[in-house]
Amino acid sequence: MIERGKFRSLTLVNWNGFFARTFDLDELVTTLSGGNGAGKSTTMAAFVTALIPDLTLLHFRNTTEAGATSGSRDKGLHGKLRAGVCYSTLDVVNSRHQRVVVGVRLQQVAGRDRKVDIKPFTIQGLPTAIQPTEILTELVAERQARVLSLPELKERVEAMEGVQFKQFNSITDYHSLMFDLGVIPKRLRSSADRSKFYRLIEASLYGGISSAITRSLRDYLLPENSGVRKAFQDMEAALRENRMTLEAIRVTQSDRDLFKHLISEATSYVAADYMRHANERRIHLDSALVLRRDLFSSRKQLVTEQYRHVEMSRELAEQSGAESDLETDYQAASDHLNLVQTAMRQQEKIERYQSDLEELTYRLEEQSEVVSEASEQQADNEARAEAAELEVDELKSQLADYQQALDVQQTRAIQYQQALQALERARALCQLPELTADNAEEWLETFHAKEQEATESLLQLEQKLSVADAAHSQFEQAYQLVVNIAGEVSRSEAWQTARELLRDWPSQQHLAERVQPLRMRLSELEQRLRAQQDAERLLQEFCKRQGNAYQPEELEALQRELESQVEELSLSVSDAGERRMAMRQELEQLKLKIQELTARAPVWLAAQDALSQLSEQSGEALEDSRQVTEYMQQLLERERETTVERDEIAASKRAIEAQIERLSQPSGAEDARLIALAERFGGVLLSEIYDDVTIDDAPYFSALYGPSRHGIVVPDLSLVREHLQGLDDCPEDLYLIEGDPQSFDDSVFAVEEHEKAVVVKIADRQWRYSRYPEVPLFGRAARENRLETLYQERDRLAERYATLSFDVQKTQRTHQAFSRFIGSHLAVAFDADPEAEIRLLNTRRGEIERALNAHEDQNQQQRQQFDQAKEGISALNRLIPLVSLLLDETLTDRVEEITEELAEAQEAARYIQQHGVSLTKLEPLLSVLQSDPQQHEQLQESYVLAQNSQRLAKQQAFALTEVVQRRAHFSYTDSAGMLTENSDLNDKLRQRLEQAEAERTRAREQLRQYQSQFTQYSQVLASLKSSYDAKRDMLKELSQELVDIGVPADANAEARARARRDELHAALSTNRSRRNQLEKQLTFCEAEMDSLQKKLRKLERDYHQIREQVVNAKAGWCAVMRMVKDNGVERRLHRRELAYMDGDELRSMSDKALGALRLAVADNEHLRDVLRLSEDPKRPERKIQFYIAVYQHLRERIRQDIIRTDDPVEAIEQMEIELGRLTEELTAREQKLAISSKSVSNIIRKTIHREQNRIRMLNQGLQAVSFGQVKSVRLNVNVREAHATLLDVLSEQQEQHQDLFNSNRLTFSEALAKLYQRLNPQMDMGQRLPQTIGEELLDYRNYLELEVEVYRGADGWLRAESGALSTGEAIGTGMSILVMVVQSWEEESRRLRGKDISPCRLLFLDEAARLDAKSIATLFELCERLEMQLIIAAPENISPEKGTTYKLVRKVFQNHEHVHVVGLRGFANEIPSLPPIAAELQQGG
């Protein structure tokens, strides 16, 4: 539910007794309590002044002046104010919770008139915390303040953010804003509305039943319904204009057709040719622009191709130079590969001979061993054979000499004894007590080693001595070997040098063995070095292509960057494809849209022409369809207002004509019946008697006779009495004066003259006071003077009526044009400008085409960047694995190091190869070099020492050897026994002899076999030595040849050389392919440049030709445009919809119009000649001259009495308006005549029924109201009997009175008035016209009677009159009536204000002490039920327990008067009383 707005407070500033006082208003009842003169009425007057600041209405009288009609000139306001600026403001919070401060600035005006100047204003958006007094006053000191002037107040308010200040120069605007904000219940459009509202407030303020309101309850409670009256006014206007319309149509039709046909055909003829030339000029300009654009683009393309040609030529030169270098490198690589292959074949031979040598060496060694073993075996066999021979011989000798054998046994026995002695001797000599026969052999090995060392030393010395003595030639041989190997050395250093050489020989051999691994390692390093160089070359090429210098460690980051770039470019390329497709699709869509807009443009242009015509007709800028419809509504409203004004003018004109007709009656009779009665009574009209009175005396006599100036002067009244019986056809008041018509004077009256007035003593107890009429009509001079004025007024009204009629038809014509526009063009008129859209789309298409070209270029650049990035990534993919290689700064050093090592190894190999044999020969001869034959003495001494050492060692070894040798003797223990046991000795010797002979035979046979085998082995060894020597010589030759080749022949050399050659071959092929590609591209580029140059020359030639055409055509076109603009016909000729037609269509259109124009101007020689001259196609300006001639001709034909323009096109439009106006009037007449009397009756009845129901609803709110003996209040509404009869006849018996409604002489209103008179003949209509009566009968309010009734005690329902009620009852009843009126206004105005606004309700009651407590309680209950605020003034506090009560006491302090105010809030809800309000601020100096 919408919360009702409330008045929060009332603020008085600088009023009498109140300097700056704010009264907080209660939501229900606010009571102002105080004695007489306390300021209660002043407070209420301030409230009313802020609510209705209309000085023509404000009248603050005391209750004692209730019946007074005049008072002081200030009407009670001037005396309530103090000198200076005063304010009265109302603080309101409406239903929207918007705080609004409304008020007035009041100021006394110096002078005797005691006037007050009032300026209303409003403040919106004021914060709640700020009180009105803070805004209206300014503190000067602690207890002093100054009142701000209105400009200062405005400046202060506007300085606050969000606060709006508005000052009003019109009370209507002030009340309009108050109504919109919900402060007042009714929109007060006029002074009459304000008067009603003030009368209501005044009735509320002074209490009682206001006769001004009860007499006009219909005006207060019933809203006006002018729909029926307006409808019949329109119908009657159509009837009056019928004949004039028909005549005007016949007069205007011929001119309109002529104008329209000639203008239409001339416009088509000239505009078609004009637009054709404009189109051709535009086409030529577009062609020139296209050619210029192509020219510039071709020049740009040629420059691009030339730049490409230069770049490709430079690259081709680089590629050619690189190809030469690559061919040289490739040839060198091929030669190197051949050398490597030759070296490899040589190496294979060397390896083969080396393997053969190794095999021969192995076989030679094996054969040597075999020969050595064979020699040893032969020596053993020879020894065994010799031993066997010796044993056989010994056995034979033993057998021959048994005694000798016996001696042998003895000898063995001795040998046994000697063995024991030798053992003891060895123990002593070797100092080995633990020596036994069993371990003697072990000790023998030890002492043999010592002996061997001593022997070796001795042998060395012996060798030296022998060399010195017997082998001097061997020393020379060894020394020569040392010199051959080591160069020149002294003889003394020969042995040391030879020893060092032999000591270094193994290391040299080791180095020689490392040649192959070092060569392989060097090959690997050289390969890495070449790879590094290739990588550096690749890096340099990469940096050159990238245009930046990159370090190897930056390559990985660069690779990531390039991969990211490739990814972005890939996405960009893919997006570019999609975007290109999207742009092409958009381009196609744009082309389709342009085609669609091109097809729609003529329709839109036609709509725009229509819209521009409407704008010119209306004078409004129509920017959207809403404005069109709103303007149509305005047109309807304007048409209604103009029609109403025209009808009012017509009514005034009819009234003046009726008055003229009445004043034109003979003898000055206003009623024709008076003449007949004067003849009947035999009298003379009084006006005829005074017909010759002067115009100066006419006012006096008119006032003198008053109503009897239309009387009849008869000679004898007694004779007239009998004629009065049954007299009905006469005026309502008929004056008969007895007197002589021939000598009549004014002596019959006792007259007393005053200033412009007379007092006529009709009788002793009856006087008549008559003022001089402003327009006297008594006497022929006065009537003629009045008639002259009326004739002038009638002429003025007739002219005004014609103007209004034309305006009505023009408005209707404009409305029809708007209707046609809405029907035909509204759907497209406010669409976007298709031409602007076409321009935008063309611009967009150009942008897209440029963007597409730029996109292609960008895409190509991106592709190039993409390819370059991919190529960079590809190069990086080759470079990244080589980063470690590029970063290997020690590679060159390692290569040099390995190269040095290999050189050393190869040097060692060559050394071994050169001196290996010498070293082999030198090794056994090393000892020879130890002693120089020239150093014999020293050797001799050394030899003696060595001999002594060797002798001792030998003695010890001999002693041990003797023991060892005599180990067999230790087994001769039985030989001692043999000396006694010799019996079987002979047999044993024989057996042993046989065994020895058999053994000798086997030894001889084995010796012969081994001698044969040794001979074979020796032959094989000699053969192997011969083959070995031959192959060794060949190997030396091959090695020398390999050295002469100078190429290492390792296993990977051929692969590296082949890979190098293949790599250079691939690079050479790539270079040749690129060079061929560049040559082809260069050829194509040259061809393209030749083609572009040819195209450029053709474009320049075509551009200069078409530019020359455009320049030549410009002069003629400028002349045409100047002529068109000078004569103001450009808007007529420049028809943009024709721009979308081709030249053939425009020529056809012009030719058709030309044929029609030839027929149209056949009778006009001037136009015919101008038309014939305009047919020259080479002189387009002559067509413009023809069009201007047609315009001039038609301008001369315009009828200025009908058409108010000199423009033929506008004349046609005005003719159309005139014809439309006339036709529409006929149509409107027929339509409005179709309105039946029954429908009028139904409308009035429905309206009456609706209002009766509304009043019944209002009555329900007053049923429980009681004041004193009054228990209830109600409002009765009844239909008048005569009017009810009229409604019944209109709806049920209209056929009986068709003579009235079908009459051409009577309007509907007059017919309705006549019907009312027919139904109620007893009623006197007085002097009112039937039209006026009929218009009153069309107002439903005249059908109703309203009266207020109260239910009082035992009397029941009585009419509410002040005389029948007590004062309190009258006040309560009057308050109830006012509440009903306010509710009615709110209901009536609900549709005019916002739906979220519920207006404030507030009434006043002064001197409320006249109500008893029960009545006061009823008022409180009524306020609570109706959400109404009430301000009560009473001498005493009448209801302190409810509402808010202010106690006002007026005090005088030091000649300064102020009102002391104490506020008390009602304590019914246990709310504590308000603290006393502080004393008034003292007025600032």
Curated annotation (Swiss-Prot):
Keywords: ATP-binding, Cell cycle, Cell division, Chromosome partition, Coiled coil, Cytoplasm, DNA condensation, DNA-binding, Nucleotide-binding. Residues 337-480, 509-605, 835-915, 977-1116 form a coiled coil. NCBIfam families: PRK04863.1. Homodimerization via its hinge domain. Binds to DNA via its C-terminal region. Interacts, and probably forms a ternary complex, with MukE and MukF via its C-terminal region. The complex formation is stimulated by calcium or magnesium. Interacts with tubulin-related protein FtsZ. Belongs to the SMC family. MukB subfamily. Gene3D superfamilies: 1.10.287.1490, 1.20.58.850, 3.40.1140.10, Immunoglobulin FC, subunit C (1.20.5.420), MukB, hinge domain (3.30.70.3500). Its main location: cytoplasm. It comes from Yersinia pseudotuberculosis serotype O:3 (strain YPIII). GO terms for biological process: cell division; chromosome condensation; chromosome segregation; DNA replication. ATP binds at residues 34-41. Residues 666-783 are annotated as: Flexible hinge. Disulfide bonds: none annotated. The hinge domain, which separates the large intramolecular coiled coil regions, allows the homodimerization, forming a V-shaped homodimer. One of its GO terms (molecular function) is DNA binding. This is Chromosome partition protein MukB. Plays a central role in chromosome condensation, segregation and cell cycle progression. Functions as a homodimer, which is essential for chromosome partition. Involved in negative DNA supercoiling in vivo, and by this means organize and compact chromosomes. May achieve or facilitate chromosome segregation by condensation DNA from both sides of a centrally located replisome during cell division. The keyword ATP-binding applies. It holds the Pfam family SbcC_Walker_B. It is found in: Cytoplasm, Nucleoid. The gene is mukB. GO terms for cellular component: cytoplasm; nucleoid.
